[in-house]
Amino acid sequence: MGPLRLLVPANIRHNSGGNVYNARLVEGLRALGAEVEVLPVEGSWPESTAKERRRMGSLIGAWERETGPGEPVAIVDGLVAVGVPDELEFAAKAGQETWVLVHMPVPEESGAGSLEREARALRAATGVICTSSWAADVLKKRHGLRGLRVALPGTDRASLAEGSIPPHIITVAALLPNKDQVLVVEALARIRELEWTAALVGSDQADPDYAGRVRAAVARHGLEDRIRIAGERKGQDLEDEWNRADLSVLVSKAEAFGMVVTEALAHGIPVVVRAGTGAVEALSFAAPEQGKSGTLPGTAVHFEGTDGPEGDSPEGPTLLAAVLRGWLQETITRDAWRAAALETRSRLPGWDQPARLVLEAVSKNWPQDSPGQS
């Protein structure tokens, strides 16, 4: 097998789960002895200009196949891939080996054109690797794809969070409409009579308009002294945020996996997620076996009938507030979630696991099954 060429979107600059996965995957592949070249590709992916698509095509051998003993194997981030279906089809015709790494399927509401581009891109690929079973299931049902590989994210070992008094609730995600921090603020406003503090940790520059909405919601309820908008944190600053936390909340409208879920669990922190998203897989895949304790390290909240396009139906915050109230007031619930999170810590896989799975998938010696149609 020749060197691996990982093509990633250059326009996603905040600390997204996809960026973290890509970086850790590269580290893992290199640790296994693979030669890896990382190429950030300019463009407003998945949208792009003709010039950007032509350059992308040249990087995957769409116009002229790179031959020789060191012929590279391309792995294209899914966000880029869905923007270049023509180029991927040309690369396939040229015999160039090109894989697609899917972090998040195209949202269903994106329209028929976007979904068709996704289907064409994935069918043209040599193979498709998904970073969650949820994403693989969506693509299989949506496009009839087969032979999809799954390489779940790994998790770094982490120190046990000390927690805080009063209990501290944390949401770690860029301030984006999909992450629905406004829902979190509205839920917290409904339990203001209880003792708690909260922090929203994540980039406020990814979508400044939405970040403004989050700040306005905090101010409207007079919660500036209780809800801290921390901005993006990395390294020890992020570790300090985790150390203060007693509960993590991730209620994204769509989530393929939710690496911050397992990151929280690695610190022994239980998590509340939205039912019907891939975050449920993250919450449960390393959880204690049902026969042993039967308790998840947190819960998945059902928002059926409340998830409008803006996520601001009045029932949503009330449902989340009820869950948070129960956790704050019921010692049995709080202790059970914490115990399950502590047990889960030792069961979380490291980053060597997805690296091995990806390397096995793209290896010439690995039996291939083109995505095609099932």
Regions found by a protein language model. Name each.
Residues 253:
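Aromatic "clamp/platform" in nucleotide-sugar-dependent glycosyltransferases that forms part
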Residues 197-216, 231-232:
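Glycosyltransferase donor-sugar binding loop
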Residues 232, 240-245:
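Short alpha-helical donor nucleotide-sugar binding micro-motif in glycosyltransferases
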Residues 47-51, 310-319, 329-364:
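A charged, aromatic-enriched C-terminal amphipathic alpha-helix characteristic of glycosyltransferases
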Residues 106, 110-130:
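Membrane-proximal helix-turn-helix segments that form the acceptor-binding/catalytic region
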Residues 134, 154:
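Carbohydrate-associated surface elements
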Residues 270-273, 280, 284:
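Short hydrophobic beta-strand element within catalytic cores of glycosyltransferases
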Residues 129, 161-190, 199-201:
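Conserved donor-binding/catalytic core segment of Leloir-type glycosyltransferases
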